[in-house]
């Protein structure tokens, strides 16, 4: 019985040592106790490290804003001359957000004060919902770009319609509004075709273009009204 008791005691001690070894709190206490021993202090040095962040976390706000606006400008160049769709592969949604807010604000200012809040909300929701649906459709058709990349391209492509909304908000003459809207609508479609470049949709481009046509036509019609 004595041998069995000793054997059980040894097993319990081994299990306790394993549990203490697996306990991170206990391990850290052991490390600290070893660190203050004279031998360790004499032979080793402790170096503290700190995570300094990455990318723009350590940049001044002025530099970060400058880089963001420069990126928006580079993507706007693509809208003006849509030849290099690779520019928009590094996607962001700052430009689309600004354009949607400006379009909604221009349309809200051209309505009665009572309806401005509802018009602003509906237009912003319509723009983002339309971009999301068109991007999801393109992705489901087998495009090799992500949904957010597609939304980035479609959002930046709405820049001409933003110009049309500003013009129509301050120019009530219909013979000026119609040519401006038609030209900006065609420009928007031309720029939005960049979402289909190198996207592996050679046999399904019509299925991808049709929703884009309806979305931008609806937005252009709202601007005209």
From Swiss-Prot:
Q: Which GO terms describe its biological process?
A: endoplasmic reticulum to Golgi vesicle-mediated transport; intracellular protein transport
Sequence intervals crossing the membrane:
91-111, 118-138, 154-176, 180-199, 205-225
Residues annotated as carrying Phosphoserine in the record are: 27-28
Which InterPro entries does the record cross-reference, listed alphabetically? Yip1/4-like, Yip1_dom
Subcellular location per the Swiss-Prot or TrEMBL entry: Membrane
Membrane topology, record value: Multi-pass membrane protein
Which keywords belong to this entry?
A: Membrane, Phosphoprotein, Transmembrane, Transmembrane helix
The positions making up the signal sequence are: none
What do the Gene Ontology cellular component annotations say?
Answer: endoplasmic reticulum; membrane; trans-Golgi network
Which GO molecular function annotation, any one, does this entry have? small GTPase binding
Task: Give the domain of life.
Answer: Eukaryota
| Database matches in Pfam families | Yip1
Q: Identify its protein family.
A: Belongs to the YIP1 family.
- UniProt subunit comment: Interacts with the YIP1 family members yip1 and yip5, and with several Rab GTPases.
Record function comment: May be involved in proper membrane localization of Rab GTPases.
Q: What is this protein called?
A: Protein YIP4
């Amino acid at each position: 019985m004595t041998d069995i008791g000793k054997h059980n005691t040894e097993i319990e001690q081994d299990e306790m040592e394993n549990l203490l070894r697996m306990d991170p709190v206990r391990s850290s206490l052991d490390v600290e106790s070893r660190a203050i021993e004279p031998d360790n202090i004499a032979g080793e040095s402790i170096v503290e490290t700190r995570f300094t962040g990455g990318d723009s976390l350590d940049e001044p706000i002025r530099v970060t804003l400058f880089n963001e606006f420069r990126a928006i400008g580079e993507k706007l160049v693509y809208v003006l001359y849509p030849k290099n769709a690779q520019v928009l592969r590094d996607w962001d949604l700052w430009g689309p957000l600004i354009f949607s807010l400006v379009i909604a604000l221009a349309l809200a200012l051209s309505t009665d004060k009572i309806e401005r809040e509802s018009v602003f909300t509906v237009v912003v929701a319509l723009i983002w919902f339309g971009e999301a649906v068109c991007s999801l459709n393109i992705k489901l058709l087998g495009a090799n770009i992500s949904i957010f990349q597609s939304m980035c391209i479609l959002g930046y492509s709405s820049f001409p319609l933003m110009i049309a909304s500003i013009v129509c908000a301050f120019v009530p003459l219909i013979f000026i509004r119609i040519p401006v809207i038609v030209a900006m609508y065609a420009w928007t479609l031309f720029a939005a075709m960049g979402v289909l470049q190198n996207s592996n949709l050679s046999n399904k481009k019509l299925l991808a273009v049709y929703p884009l046509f309806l979305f931008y036509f609806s937005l252009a019609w709202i601007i005209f009204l």
